[in-house]
Amino acid sequence: MSSKQATSPFACTVDGEETMTQDLTSREKEEGSDQHPASHLPLHPIMHNKPHSEELPTLVSTIQQDADWDSVLSSQQRMESENNKLCSLYSFRNTSTSPHKPDEGSREREIMNSVTFGTPERRKGSLADVVDTLKQKKLEEMTRTEQEDSSCMEKLLSKDWKEKMERLNTSELLGEIKGTPESLAEKERQLSTMITQLISLREQLLAAHDEQKKLAASQIEKQRQQMDLARQQQEQIARQQQQLLQQQHKINLLQQQIQVQGHMPPLMIPIFPHDQRTLAAAAAAQQGFLFPPGITYKPGDNYPVQFIPSTMAAAAASGLSPLQLQKGHVSHPQINPRLKGISDRLGRNLDPYEHGGGHSYNHKQIEQLYAAQLASMQVSPGAKMPSTPQPPNSAGAVSPTGIKNEKRGTSPVTQVKDETTAQPLNLSSRPKTAEPVKSPTSPTQSLFPASKTSPVNLPNKSSIPSPIGGSLGRGSSLDILSSLNSPALFGDQDTVMKAIQEARKMREQIQREQQQQPHGVDGKLSSMNSMGLSNCRNEKERTRFENLGPQLTGKSSEDGKLGPGVIDLTRPEDAEGSKAMNGSAAKLQQYYCWPTGGATVAEARVYRDARGRASSEPHIKRPMNAFMVWAKDERRKILQAFPDMHNSNISKILGSRWKSMSNQEKQPYYEEQARLSKIHLEKYPNYKYKPRPKRTCIVDGKKLRIGEYKQLMRSRRQEMRQFFTVGQQPQIPITTGTGVVYPGAITMATTTPSPQMTSDCSSTSASPEPSLPVIQSTYGMKMDGASLAGNDMINGEDEMEAYDDYEDDPKSDYSSENEAPEPVSAN
């Protein structure tokens, strides 16, 4: 049983079947080798073995038989697929482990043969051999196809190429094929050239595009810049128009001021005001000064001027002409004791060289003068005065060289505590003691910034006039004055010009006298101290005159005077010297106080410390700053164009111009400032600027700044104007050193408060309130711009004033641009 199971199913076949299978295999081999002999042969041996005439037709016929060849290949592929199926089935049956029955094996072989060949003869062959044979044939065909390139080319040729090949021979075809690489290289070179040209063209286009972009961007930038420039120009034009409008407004204001001043009497200023007689003559000529008709004038006599008592110190300090009263003789003990004391002091303080007959005081004349002065108080400041007879002057024959001594002798500052004390005082020297001096004769005082100048290092000018030879040329000037008694000479220009010419002549005479007698000026130089003019250029000379007296005489101060650290601002010398300090009469700011009345009221004082410089140490000037350098020429130009323009207005114009200038325009002046500073540093290596002390005013125990104090004074002045507007009477004109007639008040000293009314020009006022302001120096107090010398000060104005001092005043300091203005100076 086991042997039967182990045998294969093919072992059971008979010998006949085995023989048939072998025969079938051999026949298939023969058929396979004989069926398609031509199809398996290569084409080129056939083509080359034949002659050229038969070569092309054979090739064409072979190509035409491709369809048959394709059908054969497709049939072979179908057979191969069927054989693969049979092989897989056969391998499956062979791998089976179970024995097969003979009938089953025969049945399977029949199925296989029927599926594969469909004929009984092919059932006997070996399917494996058939499959191997077909695979080998296919591989041989593929190998021959790859080796024969020409046959592949022939298959791929189109009909056009076939026709061309029919017309051409093989050599021409081969030659054309051989020339192809050269043509390809040529074409490649042409293509590369075209590519290069295209690349360059593209680069050019890109460059042109970039240039266009840049050009457009530059045009846009230019347009933007032009728009910005146009906008800036418009803004600049707008600013310039605004500045022009502001300047036009300022010009209109100046024109209004000029028009307002035009309604006032014309200001005729003597060119050489060194002699008080000609000064008084010119001032009287321009103002139509009417002398009392009761007083006669003779060519050789002194012309009388109204008696100015000691109570007029404030009015005199505000610009009253320092006329000197001739020595008079008081012989009326029955009059008011206060008036008698005034007359006694007046007589004792007159110059010893002035003697001669004059009118004597009588009680009636003194009372008339006192009544006239009280009447003048009640007249409003701006009221125009009619020409009324003046009572005969009880002061006697008054000469213009005596009133200065009267003012010196009766000034509130220089009075001794005792009312009856009468001794000659040298008022041109600085006071020494700090004790307040009581003055029962002065209800009003004027406080001014003190003069910057000091007697130290003052040059000894030999050209300073002296009124020693007072009688020289007096007759001609008195003739002019006597001719002015008529009201018909108002505004007579010829008379004024004659007075000016006489002033020049007398100036020359006084200069000759000064050269002949240079040391005989004791007690006379103080009369020159207060010769103030409204023109700021001439006020520097007055500053030099103030301190020349103590320098030449060498006299010390009397007992009872103030110390050197305290400056009395009620003295006319100090008041007018303060004008020269600022370089402008408009800068003269006046401060007032009101005593309670009686003989125990103390004077108001300005207490200041010295700069820390010894009296023997020379004063070193400060170098000019950029503004002062620039304004030096500008101020002269303005003065040439407008000689009558006030210094304050010029300073405002210059300050406005300086502020409107650009830094580039200011640059050369800053360079000049640096150069001057360098020279100054080389000249004075140890120089150290010592600023002035600040000032405050104490009123009713309160510390006020100068601006607040001035505002308070204005309000009180307005109250007093309203209080004294009733019962106006004609007032007595007062001729000042500046040639301006102040219709202000002349008050006699009384035990009750006697307020004084003055004009707006002098700014002198009074108040019955018992307030006692004291101006003292405070270093810690910083002053603002509103409390300085001017109410409406602008930047650069103080620098201009400092420049004025620099030009003419040897004792002045020079402020810089970044420095706060300091209108007060110490000794």
Curated annotation (Swiss-Prot):
Residues 25-34, 341-357 have a biased composition (Basic and acidic residues). There is a cross-link at K404, K417 (Glycyl lysine isopeptide (Lys-Gly) (interchain with G-Cter in SUMO)). Sumoylation inhibits the transcriptional activity. Residues 620-688 bind DNA. The keyword Transcription regulation applies. CDD domains: HMG-box_EGL13-like. Keywords: Activator, Coiled coil, Cytoplasm, Developmental protein, Differentiation, DNA-binding, Isopeptide bond, Nucleus, Phosphoprotein, Repressor, Transcription, Transcription regulation, Ubl conjugation. The keyword Coiled coil applies. Homodimer. Interacts with DAZAP2. May interact with CENPK. This is Transcription factor SOX-6. It comes from Rattus norvegicus (Rat).
